[in-house]
Every structure is written in C-alpha cells, then in structure tokens.
Amino acid sequence: PHNIHFITSPSERVQLAVIGNRPSYIGFIPNPTEKVQLKAVEKRPECIFLLQKPAEKVQLTAVLKDPRYLSAIREPTEKVQLAAVQKNPECIRHIAEPTEKVQHMAVQRSPDIFRQIRQPEESVRLAAVQAKGEKSGTCPPRPKLYNWRLSETIR
C-alpha cells in the first residue's frame, strides 16, 4: 500500500485495496474516485483533511459523523452546510459565506449564534432578535426601587 504514490494512474480497484488497509493513504492517490473517497472517510472521517476536492456525498458523510469536519472542506455545498449547522450551529463560523438559508437554520437552533456570522443578512438579524424575545417571553417586570427619602417603594 505504501507504494501507491509510485503508480501514475492506479485503477479504482487498486485504490480501494489500498484504502481498505490504510485509509490515510488516500492523500497519496491523485484524483481518487468518489467511491474511494467515500470508503476512506467512512473508515476514518479525518481523511477528509487529505482530500483536495471531496465529492458532496463524501463531505456529507464526514460532516454527519462530526460537524467540525466542515472546517476541512474548502467549498461546502449548501446541503453540507445545512447538515453541519443542524447538528451544531456553531459550525457556521467555519463557513466563509453561508447562504441565507444556512444562516436562518443556525439562528433558529441558537439565536446568539448570529454574532459568529461574518455578514449576517438583515432577515437573519431580525430572526435572531425575534427568537431571543420568544425564548425570554415578555419583558421582565421592572424591579421595585426603594426611595429612602420618601420611605416608600417606587414602581
């Protein structure tokens, strides 16, 4: 398996045999097929870091195992972004340009997360404010103050 980098164009069968023994060797395979990428990431999700352009299915597999693997993906598709943010809203900080839909998903799951969005859409800011208001219910009652001069409680 360790000689894979000496083969110019290994067949998919050879690639799969190598990955079956050592998933991390995917880094030595030039342009691995989607099937090979998937096998490596299914065995060891951290192999996503070794892939230049992982296929969407491979991205999803890694992110569903652990949303933090999103940080290894240069250009995650919206579907992958949504899957990661649905599992862990804080993953939005690893997305350079989250779509409005992804931003809304993150804010629905955790309203305070909008602070971690680089350029939140106006509708997302509004949704965050509304969500925070709904979670806290109505405004809390004003505290009673005691006026020492008048010796009475003021509302």
What do these predicted regions represent?
Residues 1-155:
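Alpha-helical scaffold segments
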